[in-house]
Each structure stands twice: as C-alpha cells, then as structure tokens.
Amino acid sequence: MKPTTIASLQKCKQDKKRFATITAYDYSFAKLFADEGINVMLVGDSLGMTVQGHDSTLPVTVADIAYHTAAVRRGAPNCLLLADLPFMAYATPEQAFENAATVMRAGANMVKIEGGEWLVETVQMLTERAVPVCGHLGLTPQSVNIFGGYKVQGRGDEAGDRLLSDALALEAAGAQLLVLECVPVELAKRITEALAIPVIGIGAGNVTDGQILVMHDAFGITGGHIPKFAKNFLAETGDIRAAVRQYMAEVESGVYPGEEHSFH
C-alpha cells in the first residue's frame, strides 16, 4: 500500500470525500486500524487519560508521546501519523522544534499543537524546518484550567470570528491540517469552507473534511463521562474490526456524526 500523505488528504478535500481518522497508542490497534483501511492516525496526549489513567492530558510528556509513536509506526508503517506535542512542550519556538524533532524521529509525519494566533511564529519556524504542523482549535484540552472545564467553544459572533481568525492565521503561517474540537456546526462549516487545508472535526458536526475519534470512545471502553459527540460502534457490531469499518462508512457517507452528536 502506498503511504498516505498530506497531499492525499488535500485531494479528499478537493473531491469532497470525507475521511475517517482515529487515535492509536500501540502496535496491535494501529495494525488493526491500518488493515481495515484507516490511513490517518493520531498519537494523542489523550493517552494521559485513556492509557495512563490521569484526569487530564497535562501529565503527558514528550517521552510518552515518542514511545507510543514508535509503537504505532511499527503497526501502521504507511499511515499518515500525527503526534501531539503535549502540555508545555512548545512554550517557545525553540522548545517546539527540539520536541518536534524527538517525535518525528520516533516515526511521526506531523506534529499537532493547540492554540491560535500566538502560535504563528512557532508554526512558521517548524514548517520552514521541514516539520509539518496540524493546528488544533476550539476546545483545546491542554487549556482545561483556563476554560474551567471541557466546554463548547466559539459560541456567539465574537468568539466565532476569533476562532475563524485563528484558523486563517495558522493556515497562513504554514499549518497543513487543522483539528476543530467541540464547536458549533455552523462555525465548523464557516471555517472548513474558508480554509484551503483539510479540517478534521471532533464534536464539530459532519461538515468538516474528516473526523477523528478517540479509539476508546469509538469502542465504548471509556470510563466515566462519555462525550456527546462520541458513538459506540462496537455496541452495534459486536466485533472490533466491523466497528472500525462501520465508523469509516458512516463518516464517509456523512451519517456520523449525526444531529445527536453535534452542537449549535
């Protein structure tokens, strides 16, 4: 199988062909996802909660991300692999570059960082040095203490305009992908249509170019609170491989996420 690249996703956007992505943290699941046709995976700092058992993503280190990135890469050698730079790993452009180099050496194709216009210099520095960047706007879990919890972002004209401005600034700085998390569908549509780069949604309705889910949410094995945007595909299929195929099919057809998974 040919490796999936940024250009592959750009073509999906141009052809209006939705694509499914998922988080992965180990060899076995990465291989299973790749075998079933998921070509884009994220080693997310969500592993702090789903794998390590913390109550937020804040304790995750660059070494943690690099360890899991290497495992996922071995399981899915041809996937487009994104890796999060965790909390306080990109406070300055120089720090971002050093830490990005670590996760790229571990096997990532691209790093994901959370934040808006304040990251422009960092995004420029990374892309100029051959480190592709995926932005992340809306609900950015590393900022949970600023937001006062996990809440929908971008409601109201002023907040929506600010997020759109941030998205355009990140794209202009060189970001090649954008994740939009927990924003109203109407705003997600505005941003997706305004950007030339592909937009991946999670809790942003079915109007984005792609979707991502935390694998534990997709299989209903998350303890405690289940996000509104999550869907347990394993409950409907009774088989992990079938669940992955159904997730992909529903994303590609626009069935998932439905109205019940979306915010306004």
From Swiss-Prot:
Mg(2+) binds at D45, D84, E114. It catalyses: 3-methyl-2-oxobutanoate + (6R)-5,10-methylene-5,6,7,8-tetrahydrofolate + H2O = 2-dehydropantoate + (6S)-5,6,7,8-tetrahydrofolate. It comes from the Bacteria. GO terms for biological process: pantothenate biosynthetic process. Gene3D superfamilies: Phosphoenolpyruvate-binding domains. Homodecamer; pentamer of dimers. This is 3-methyl-2-oxobutanoate hydroxymethyltransferase. It comes from Escherichia coli O81 (strain ED1a). The lineage of its organism: Bacteria, Pseudomonadati, Pseudomonadota, Gammaproteobacteria, Enterobacterales.
